[in-house]
Amino acid sequence: MYMLNNMLNDVPTPWGMFFQDSATPNMEGMMELHNNVMFYLCMMLGFVSYMLYNMLTTYNHSVLPYKYLYHGQFIEIVWTTFPAMILLIIAFPSFILLYICDEVIAPAMTIKAMGLQWYWKYEYSDFIDDKGETIEFESYMIPEDLLEEGQLRQLDVDSPIVCPVDTHMRFIVTAADVIHDFAMPSLGIKIDAVPGRLNQTSALIQREGVYYGQCSELCGVMHSSMPIKIEAVSLGEFLAWIDEQ
């Protein structure tokens, strides 16, 4: 009897050509939409390729076989209605997913992320420390010469975000200087951090793990030095971490 263990891909990989493994319902919906759209695109590509091949071979062996045919009403209707139907089939699930991802459903906690050149600042506005102030901290990328065994180059930080699983969370994202972007591929999050503006998104992490993201908006010479690290833990471990702050 063989035991098969899943190896989850929650970090960027060299020459990666596909999505990271999903950890939220939103990301699962995005991957399903991508697969459905690719199915229709492959069908259209195959059909158009067949038609082009058929036309080339037909006209190659015949000398103007349809020289008196100026138009075909039926085929004109087909090539107009068929693409329109395909676009509608693609559009409806896309719009539904778009509105679902934009909806913030009764968040149990809020995390504020502020982008600065070139680090992140986080605030847990629902929790206070011993001084009666909200819990906040800055997160910097660990330099390559200080990395420990098992840490990832240009992805690990000194102070990661810690959050509980199976909890509706709201991320409020802004910036203090230039435009940044808070992106977490495994969570299906990518939202601009704009100075003077508060953007929000939500996440429901369904499994424990460590997730990595990066600033996805060119923000200066040290743009690549703004990684994001989220540690998703159980509720008990999260409350213990809060008590230590």
From Swiss-Prot:
One of the GO BP terms on file: ATP synthesis coupled electron transport
Membrane topology according to the record: Multi-pass membrane protein
Molecular function per GO: copper ion binding; cytochrome-c oxidase activity
Effect upon mutating M169I: In strain: CBS 5512
Stretches in topological domain Mitochondrial intermembrane: 1-36, 102-245
Domain of life: Eukaryota
Record text on cofactor binding: Binds a dinuclear copper A center per subunit.
Residues that coordinate or bind Mg(2+): E217
Family assignment from sequence similarity: Belongs to the cytochrome c oxidase subunit 2 family.
Name of the molecule in the record: Cytochrome c oxidase subunit 2
Primary gene name: COX2
